[in-house]
Amino acid sequence: MEELLKELSKRAEEEILKAKSLQEIESLRVKYLGKKGELTQILRGMGSLSPEERPVIGQLANDVREKIENMILERREKIAKEEKERKIKEEYIDITMPGKPYKYGHKHPITLVMDEIKRIFLGLGFSIAEGPEVELAYYNFEALNTPEDHPARDLQDTFYITSDILLRTQTSPVQVRTMEKTKPPIRVISPGRVYRSDDIDATHSPVFHQMEGLVVDEGITMGDLKGVLNVFAKKFFGEQTKTKFRPHFFPFTEPSAEMDVSCFACGGKGCRVCGYTGWIEILGAGMVHPNVLRMSGIDPEKYTGFAFGLGIDRIAMLKYGIEDLRLLFENDMRFIEQF
């Protein structure tokens, strides 16, 4: 039995040293030390030994078991370390190498135009004011000098939520909210979404974007309005741009006007873009109606002001030569990636 134990110890040592994986080590542990392992089978035969042999063989068997256990433990630790080092080497990242560039998104044409207009007016001393898109009918109509029998208040033109709550049809309500909270002098612009009950086609949408402008102070005149809008037109469309004001009607301004700019496509000579007139309409404006000032808590005898509103979507279409408004909202990457 002594020879069997020595031969088993030698064979186990050779096999353990040759093991290349943790799975092989576990198999060898079961082979030699498991319940049905070779060492266990040898030990079961100790009952046939004489009383003198049992202590000697028992001690030798324990030494062999301890040796095999230690060798398995050492080999397991070494293999685990080697596998860890190999894995680290395989997954090594050279932090000195340049990273892969991210594919960044870019701004939508409406956002590009809105940001450019904001920069111009912020440079002229304006600040940005905001208001709710779900608005009270009072701010959308009454406070803007729009009587109850005005056509704009019809259900066919306005999205009503209740009889006195609606989706704002213009950014003008921000004027009133600003004047209620702020004492003159006031110089604000208010960009945002507005809603009207229009059928979708190449030039109409039930959701579009406007930007409102408001100035209120002592001694404000129509000349101030023209001066500010002339500066805007030249900065946005180019220094060569000319402007033209035409009389118009808005219930919340008096006098009122629409402003045209010389066609930037043909320089005012006449082309398809401007309808061969040489001019393109871009916004409506006027002096704030005394009733609007009064309803906002501002004395019209002391203060005057001007307001203007422009359609961001329309200006974006003009600037980029877009002929169909629907392209701005269809999320067609072939179109959007051009900007």
UniProtKB/Swiss-Prot annotation:
The keyword Magnesium is annotated on this UniProt entry: yes
GO molecular function list: ATP binding; catalytic activity, acting on a protein; magnesium ion binding; phenylalanine-tRNA ligase activity; transferase activity; tRNA binding
Enzyme class: ligase
A cellular-component GO term for this protein: cytoplasm
This enzyme's EC code(s): 6.1.1.20
Subcellular location as annotated: Cytoplasm
CC cofactor note: Binds 2 magnesium ions per tetramer.
GO biological process terms on file: phenylalanyl-tRNA aminoacylation
Keywords of this entry: Aminoacyl-tRNA synthetase, ATP-binding, Cytoplasm, Ligase, Magnesium, Metal-binding, Nucleotide-binding, Protein biosynthesis
Cofactor section: Mg(2+)
Catalysed transformations (reactions): tRNA(Phe) + L-phenylalanine + ATP = L-phenylalanyl-tRNA(Phe) + AMP + diphosphate + H(+)
Subunit structure: Tetramer of two alpha and two beta subunits.
Family as reported in the entry's similarity comment: Belongs to the class-II aminoacyl-tRNA synthetase family. Phe-tRNA synthetase alpha subunit type 1 subfamily.
Xref: HAMAP family: Phe_tRNA_synth_alpha1 (MF_00281)
Protein name per the record: Phenylalanine--tRNA ligase alpha subunit
Organism encoding this protein: Caldanaerobacter subterraneus subsp. tengcongensis (strain DSM 15242 / JCM 11007 / NBRC 100824 / MB4) (Thermoanaerobacter tengcongensis)
Gene: pheS
